[in-house]
Swiss-Prot record:
Transmembrane segments: none
GO biological process terms, semicolon-separated: L-proline biosynthetic process
EC number: 1.2.1.41
Function in brief: Catalyzes the NADPH-dependent reduction of L-glutamate 5-phosphate into L-glutamate 5-semialdehyde and phosphate. The product spontaneously undergoes cyclization to form 1-pyrroline-5-carboxylate.
Keywords: Amino-acid biosynthesis, Cytoplasm, NADP, Oxidoreductase, Proline biosynthesis
PROSITE patterns: PROA (PS01223)
Phylogenetic placement of the source organism: Bacteria, Thermotogati, Deinococcota, Deinococci, Thermales
Family: Belongs to the gamma-glutamyl phosphate reductase family.
Protein name, as recorded: Gamma-glutamyl phosphate reductase
Biochemical pathway: Amino-acid biosynthesis; L-proline biosynthesis; L-glutamate 5-semialdehyde from L-glutamate: step 2/2
Length: 413
């Protein structure tokens, strides 16, 4: 598609922004949940066509996993929609209202960001989750999904249009770029009508958007996530957290990629970890200190400690203590999700305070870095940059604040 036609799509969406913010957005979310339940087979049929083509073209297993919609996804998506609908409206509230000496009352009002461009790879569930979050906050969305999920996305956007119609909202609130041409990504990056761009996908996509964008970018970058097993850890708990983080769904950004083990518990813990991971088909790649304690692990290369596998591969490193664990995470982590397993509150609180990540956990799985699990209903992504949001981005993170002043005829002297 041409840059001109993309501009026209965006311009039509912008013109309806005020209608979206003032309209019955919760009704649209509830209508979408009902439509998904009634028409899920249509969506699955489109998804199967995408999967068949992706398999023919040799799409990697990790991407096939993200592309596939399953029966259980229906419950997750509909629960997320209904949970977001129940959340308080983030718009219109005035925060910090204070009276000045001259009687003028000033505060800051929550308003939508505006028109959001969302560029994402083969993950059709995001077409529901991301739109629901943006819509709750009164924003319009211009979507450019991965070519592998084009049929799935088209089917889901068609349902969104029906839901918007039932709620009396304009279809332009959700617009799918009608092409799989990669040039459309570059055109969106140059589209100055957008208020924000959110890329969600691999490193290559994120870097491309950050490099080419002419508007602000909120990046959902890779998840090089660690679990530190402290010397005072409950080792049975640590084993459960490692298994859940790595094997429940290895191809997602909050999956576990590295286990750091205190040297005082390494001999007791690592053989148990290897046995459990081997039963799940996980390959271990270990540091020189860990290798003698493991039967089938292979040496970890120095250049892979900052790699996101999104697969059944797990790195293991023995560390001298909390200090070395913190240094390793600071060097190789991606500011996504980090966890500590310990019964020592002092060590835990130091970890929580010093680790720089969008979610830091104590005695819990990295898999909890998710909008639904954290009570946001859903998320548009997990921001690993600190401006303008950090961590899972729910409706509140897709608003901004404008100053308002309530007067009684005051003039400046």
């Amino acid at each position: 598609m041409t840059a001109t036609s993309l501009w026209e799509l965006a311009e039509r969406a912008r013109k309806r922004l005020s209608e979206i913010a003032k309209g019955n957005r919760d009704r649209a979310l509830l209508a979408m949940a009902d439509l998904l339940e009634a028409r899920w087979e249509e969506v699955l049929r489109a998804n199967r066509e995408d999967l068949e083509e992706a398999e023919r073209t040799g799409l990697p297993k990790a991407k096939l996993d993200r592309l596939a919609l399953k029966e259980k996804d229906l419950k997750t998506l509909t629960e997320g929609l209904r949970q977001i609908a129940r959340l308080p409206d983030p718009l219109g509230r005035i925060e910090g209202l204070a009276k000045r000496p001259n009687g003028l009352r000033v505060g800051r009002m929550r308003v939508p960001l505006g028109l959001i461009g969302f560029i994402y790879e083969a993950r059709p569930g995001a077409t529901v989750e991301a739109v629901s979050v943006a819509l709750k906050a009164g924003n319009a969305m211009l979507l450019r999904g991965g070519k592998e999920a084009f049929r799935s996305n088209r089917a889901l956007v068609a349902l969104w249009h029906e839901a918007l119609g039932e709620a009396g909202l304009p279809e332009e609130a959700v617009t799918l770029v009608p092409t799989t041409d990669r040039e459309a990504v570059l055109e969106m990056c140059r589209l100055e009508l957008l208020d924000l761009l959110i890329p969600r996908g691999g490193e290559e996509l994120i870097r491309l958007v950050q490099r080419e964008a002419r508007v602000p970018v909120l990046a959902h970058a890779k998840g090089v996530n660690h679990l530190y097993v402290d010397k005072k850890a409950d080792l049975s708990m640590a084993l459960r957290l490692a298994l859940n983080g790595k094997t429940q769904r290895p191809a997602v950004c909050n999956a576990l990629e590295t286990v750091l083990v205190h040297e005082k518990v390494a001999e007791a813990f690592l053989p148990r970890l290897e046995k459990a991971m081997r039963e799940k088909g996980v390959e271990l790649r270990a540091c020189p200190r860990a290798l003698p304690l493991l039967k089938e692990a292979v040496p970890a290369r120095e250049d892979e400690w900052d790699r996101e596998y999104l697969d059944l591969v797990l790195r293991v490193k023995v560390v001298s203590g909390l200090e070395e664990a913190l240094a390793h995470i600071a060097r190789y982590g991606s500011r996504h999700t980090e966890a500590i397993c310990t019964e020592d509150p002092k060590a835990a609180w130091r970890f929580l305070e010093e680790v720089d990540a969008s979610l830091v956990l104590w005695n819990a799985s990295t898999r909890f870095n998710d909008g639904f699990e954290l009570g946001l209903g859903a998320e548009i992504g997990i921001s690993t940059s600190k401006l303008h949001a950090y961590g899972p981005m729910g409706p509140m993170e897709l608003t901004t604040l404008k100053w308002v002043a309530l007067g009684e005829g005051q003039e400046r002297t």
